[in-house]
From Swiss-Prot:
Protein's UniProt keywords contain Hydrolase: yes
Annotated source species: Candida albicans (strain SC5314 / ATCC MYA-2876)
Similarity comment: family membership: Belongs to the peptidase C54 family.
Keyword Protein transport appears in the UniProt entry: yes
Gene name, Swiss-Prot/TrEMBL: ATG4
Protein name: Cysteine protease ATG4
Length: 446
């Protein structure tokens, strides 16, 4: 009988070796399941992707009210129909190529995001090679979720304004350079100063809000596209609104509408419970356009809630670009829920008002419930030597104007510069994407 050698040391793998082996096993396991499922799918059996599992069936009459973009429902079927009527934009594959940046992410990095999604393979199996271009991005799977949720927010804003113009609205978001709100144009305007976002890099709320503003500003304010007039876009970075500025917009422009975007962070690792009721209030407002945000590593479009569960559309299902446009692919019967305690603190909130009376009504509702997120001021404070607070949101007129973090007043910046202090503190917002990727931050003072 062999005796154990007391001098022989057990073989212990390093942490890095163990992690590497685990990653390999995970990938191999996923690939095995993928091939098995693909084989079953090509033989006629398909499953709904896990990320798109629908909400569970409920009784027709529910005990708790469902709130969706300012509408209240006590009947599940009615709520379900309303949710399904909203526009849903998700990952797309096979769109007009977006050239990669020399020093940016490589398209091949996102190969797993496409190959491990059965729906993409089923719908485009014959043209599989066209999805994998080493020099160009032909899909945003794996990196474009914040862009897609921002498109969701903007598209449903336009749908509130023009409920009978759904086909015309969807045309504005087609994945090509000629469509005003395409992913191509989001990338184009975000590549400018101060963001410098490259194709394949993840957006955060700041980048998303500035991109929407720039794209809207490129269109003449009095110009209509297929009967659709694009609203004015304002960014309130630290959630301050000034009454006199809103009044000026409506006084100067007849039939104006204003989309106010709040790119905010409401906590460190998770949303502080202090803000829960305020988030629910903004979603319940009849002026709500929803929230683009999510949980860590993913961005979702939140459009309502039931009790403490937020209702959202998930953009992480890749669909193949179709010509002519398949309108059914811009609606989904599979929406999900997320408890507010799991919500990532970094988000972009949208509010739409179409006249000064609506703004006053929105303001009154916020003051009545003591909303902790939005703050109102009667007048814009002039920039003076004794000023400690600067205007907290500004309007971009063209590409040359910069996106300024107005949490720091100009006077404070000047004082810091006189004292030799740096004013280039990084933006506190984190990107909602794969956290292993590089984070695009916006400088506070540019």
């Amino acid at each position: 009988m062999n005796q154990p050698n007391p001098n022989k040391q057990p073989i212990v793998q390093s942490t890095s070796e163990q992690t590497s082996n685990e990653e390999v096993d995970t990938v191999l396991g996923r690939f095995t399941l993928f091939v098995k499922d693909l084989s079953n799918g090509l033989n006629g059996s398909q499953e709904v992707p896990p990320s798109q599992e629908s909400v569970s069936e409920e009784a027709e009459v529910i005990s708790r009210k469902i709130i969706v973009l300012g509408q209240t429902f006590d009947n599940f079927d009615n709520a379900n129909d309303y949710i399904e009527s909203k526009l849903w934009l998700s990952y797309r594959c096979g769109f007009e190529p977006i050239p990669k940046s020399i020093d940016g992410p490589q398209p091949i990095q996102f190969f797993p995001s496409i190959i491990f999604n059965r729906s993409t393979i089923y719908s485009n199996f014959a043209n599989l090679k066209s999805l994998f271009d080493k020099e160009n991005f032909t899909s945003d799977a794996g990196w474009g979720c914040m862009i897609r949720t921002s498109q969701n927010l903007l598209a449903n804003t336009l749908l509130k304004l023009y409920p009978k113009n759904e086909p015309e609205i969807v045309k504005l978001f087609q994945d090509d350079t000629s469509s005003p709100f395409s992913i191509h144009n989001f990338i184009r305007v975000a590549s400018l100063s101060p963001l410098h976002v490259k194709p394949g890099e993840w957006f955060g709320p700041n980048a998303a809000s500035l991109s929407i503003k720039r794209l809207a500003s490129e269109l003449l304010q009095d110009q209509e596209i297929d009967g659709i007039k694009i609203p004015r876009v304002f960014i309130s970075e630290n959630s301050d609104l000034f009454d006199d500025e809103i009044r000026d917009v409506f006084a100067k422009e007849k039939n104006a509408s204003v989309l106010i975007l709040f790119p905010i962070r409401l906590g460190i690792d998770k949303v502080n419970s202090y803000y829960y009721n305020s988030i629910f209030h903004l979603l319940a407002s009849k002026y709500s356009c929803g929230i683009a945000g999510g949980k860590p590593s993913s961005s979702f479009y939140f459009l309502g809630y039931e009790d403490t569960d937020l209702i959202y559309f998930d953009p992480h299902l890749p669909q193949v670009v179709e010509t002519p446009i398949n309108m059914d692919s811009y609606h989904t019967t599979n929406y999900n829920r997320l408890n507010i305690s799991l919500l990532d603190p970094s988000m972009m909130i949208g509010i739409l008002v179409t006249n000064i009376d609506e703004y006053i009504d929105f303001k009154t509702s916020c003051l009545d419930i003591n909303n902790k997120i939005v703050h109102f001021h009667p007048h814009t404070l002039p920039v003076q030597q004794d000023s400690i607070i600067n205007q907290s949101w500004e309007e971009v007129q063209d590409e040359e104007e910069e996106f300024i973090n107005l949490n720091v007043s100009k006077i404070e910046n000047e004082q810091q510069q006189e004292q030799g202090q740096s004013t280039d503190a990084p933006d506190e917002f984190i990107d909602i994407g794969n956290q292993s990727s590089s984070v695009v931050s916006v400088p506070s003072n540019v």
